[in-house]
Amino acid sequence: MNDDGKPERTLSVVIPVYNERQTVLQMIEKVLKLVIVAEVVVIDDGSTDGTREILEKTAFDRRVRLFFHERNRGKGAALRTGFGHVKGEVVAIQDADLEYDPDEFNEMIRPIRDGVADVVYGSRLSGGKPQRVHLFWHRVGNGFLTFVTDLLYNVTLTDMETCYKMFRREVLEGIRIESDDFSVEPELTAKICRNKRWRVYEIPISYYGRSFEEGKKITWRHGISALWTLLKYRVKK
């Protein structure tokens, strides 16, 4: 808390964006409403649907910082760019597609502020929060990948593939992201779980998943890549 009794603005929110012209401004506005947010780092990853032009023409709050990739390089590359520019003590990942509610950050940041966690995952599968009905095979695939994660790394996560990951900045400074694509999700999890010094918490979150018709980008191929990534970092020195 600051001298006025309000939560301090300590959170940097990193938003990787690719072809989200319909939702990106709404998501940025939702994030900026949070009193804990110090900055919003937006990385347009070579969008071709007009997203970049919308971002460039919009007069944003001074807390918003924009970065642009000239071509589509992938979510991992976008996060690498974003993480390299954050200034907040705590960093969170936010997709631009409205599947996740930024209000959840108020709960997720508490274990970090209380000094009991270094990393907090927002779990869509631990129960207790509203959920839009999932695509069945996505649910099965995520459940399988989470089981493999728990087995390989001796942890008890319930939602390895969640977008909502929050870190003390020092944690990110200790991780070198190698993946350019969606494999960044299992890579981050693998490297976090391998480092037994980092305390990981899970917090239940709400989730309003999109259909493919609404713009969902994850397919079964990403699941195979995620499995390979988990196995690779289990044995990699």
Predicted segments — roles?
Residues M1-R9, L152-N154, I177-K237:
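Hydrophobic helical membrane-anchoring modules
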Residues V17, I43-D45, H69:
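Conserved sequence signature across two-component system core domains
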Residues E20-K33:
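Short, well-formed alpha-helical segments that are part of the catalytic scaffolds
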Residues E20-T23, S47, K75, D101:
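Donor nucleotide-sugar binding loop of glycosyltransferases
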Residues A38-V41, R52-H85:
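Conserved donor nucleotide-binding strand/loop of the catalytic core
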Residues D44-E53, L98:
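A conserved acidic beta->alpha catalytic loop
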Residues H69-H85, V90, P102-F182, Y208-L227:
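Acceptor/aglycone-binding surface of glycosyltransferases and processive sugar-polymer synthases
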